[in-house]
Amino acid sequence: MNLEILQKKKEECRTWKNVEPWFLQLKEACKIEKSNLKIDYGDWFSIGNRADLGDEEYEIIVQTAKKLIPWRKGPFKIFDLEIDSEWQSNIKYNLIRPYFNLKDKVVADIGCNNGYYMFRMLEDCPKRLIGFDPSPLTLHQFEFVNHFVKSDIVYEMLGVEHLEFYNHKFDFIFMLGVLYHRPDPVGTLKSLARGLNSKGEILIDTFMIDGEEEICLTPNKRYSKIPNIYFIPTIPALKNWLERAGFENIEVLATTITTSQEQRKTPWSFDESLEDFLDPNDSSKTVEGYPAPKRVYVKARKIM
């Protein structure tokens, strides 16, 4: 597979009719050059203060952030402008944070969205940090934030299927909220294994259903109004998938029920969010009648 051709898409996409307005607005924001800005790696990933900008500069920041709506992951605070994303991604990050040490490691984030988790990971001082996501919108959101952060994070407009062909292997791979979008979950986990160095580790989360049987739910057409949800396993079924893909030391870190504290509508998001995806008369079910979203977080190590 020739990744160079695929990587050129990163630049070519900027001329697409729906993408060009984002790119042109981003270019305006990137004319603002500031150095030695204060960075806060907390729940609100923050860069700079309002006092760092003149009025015209701040207005460009506001207009750029608004042009790049919807912001699904965050929250961010850019020169004190609060971008309150649909997902409070700090909740997930704080949950998994005790389970990894990225210092001096080569790290990948598959389905990295706008890079919120990667910006938080900078505090861990990884050797190299690379995000994979084919979305032009989230690429521009990432570049907007990173223009001021000035990190060495690499953002590749590639998917998990390209991981094993990348030009080097990884010590640690995150794949959060991706597996249920893949029609071949075992094949996807095998791609992660092939992208790892020997004894490398993964940390994933995915939708789950309760039960001790080795089975999974296969939604018909949509799940929680999402069309591309293919397989939702029990924990025993997920462990089987991981073992078949070449992983050992499989550790269940946590299970959580998605709440409106974590996912909700904001002025920076889509018109619909979690409350619109659940049965209005029974929040334990989706609008389609399936069990409401529940997630399992798992860490595992490559066998060889």
Curated annotation (Swiss-Prot):
EC primary class: transferase
EC number: 2.5.1.-
Keywords: Transferase, tRNA processing
Keyword field contains tRNA processing: yes
Domain of life: Bacteria
A single BP term in Gene Ontology: tRNA wobble uridine modification
UniProt xrefs under InterPro entries: CmoB (IPR010017), Mo5U34_MeTrfas-like (IPR027555), SAM-dependent_MTases_sf (IPR029063)
GO molecular function, one term: transferase activity, transferring alkyl or aryl (other than methyl) groups
Reactions catalysed, as given in the entry: carboxy-S-adenosyl-L-methionine + 5-hydroxyuridine(34) in tRNA = 5-carboxymethoxyuridine(34) in tRNA + S-adenosyl-L-homocysteine + H(+)
Pfam families: Methyltransf_9 (PF08003)
Sequence positions that bind carboxy-S-adenosyl-L-methionine: K73, W87, K92, G111, D133, P134, S135, V160, E161, Y180, R295
CDD domains: AdoMet_MTases
Assembly and binders: Homotetramer.
Function: Catalyzes carboxymethyl transfer from carboxy-S-adenosyl-L-methionine (Cx-SAM) to 5-hydroxyuridine (ho5U) to form 5-carboxymethoxyuridine (cmo5U) at position 34 in tRNAs.
Family: Belongs to the class I-like SAM-binding methyltransferase superfamily. CmoB family.
Protein name per its UniProtKB record: tRNA U34 carboxymethyltransferase
Organism listed in the record: Aliarcobacter butzleri (strain RM4018) (Arcobacter butzleri)
